[in-house]
Each structure stands twice: as structure tokens, then as C-alpha cells.
Amino acid sequence: MKQHSPRFLSIVADSKKRIEEITPQILKEKMDSLEPLCLIDVREDNEWASGHIPGAIHLGKGIIERDIEKEVPDSQTLIIVYCSGGFRCALVADSLQNMGYSQVYSLTTGLQGWIDAGYNIKK
């Protein structure tokens, strides 16, 4: 498991105070019920290429603020963001809320939690 630096963990913890998180199980329920949502993978290009949650779109953490309004113009859209382990996506969720998106959730355990729960990924 990757060891994160104390300063990175500090800013993630700060972001997590302001955001809502969602578990893999609740995300799967929402997807199975066909609830309208936008699932966004915020990992790097090479991570996306190695596999992602079916139905997700890819907007890496480095470009999401620049491109989100083109991909998701309605700020009321239910958005769920994920990364590998739930850290980077917390930062992204906080940023999207600052941009006026009102229904943003971070996948608490990231893609690894999705896989650990036994759910499929698309390669």
C-alpha cells in the first residue's frame, strides 16, 4: 500500500470535513436502480486504462476543474467521484463543491474498495 505524506493526508482530512462520502455498496445500489448520476474517475490516464468502474467517465484530477462544466453543465447533477483509495477524490469533491456543484460524493474507499466488495471493473 502506498504511504502518503503527512501534508497530503492533512489536506485530505480537511476536505473530508466538508464533503459527503459514499460506500461502494450504496454506489452499486444507485447504479443498479438506474438512478441518474455521473460517475467520474479522477485517476491518471494510465490508471484509467488499467480498469475502471463500468459507466464511469474519465476526468483526471489535473483537468477536472477545467473540463467539468463541459461534461456536466447542470450543477444539480448527482456526481460521484473516485480515485484509487479515496484520497484524491475527496480533494476533487471539495473542489467541485467550491465550483457550485451541490450533489457531489466521494467514493470512500476508491476503486480498491469497489474491487474488494466484489464488484466488476471494465478494462
PLM regions: where:
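Rhodanese-like catalytic fold shared by cysteine-dependent sulfurtransferases
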Residues: 1-38, 45-78, 84-123
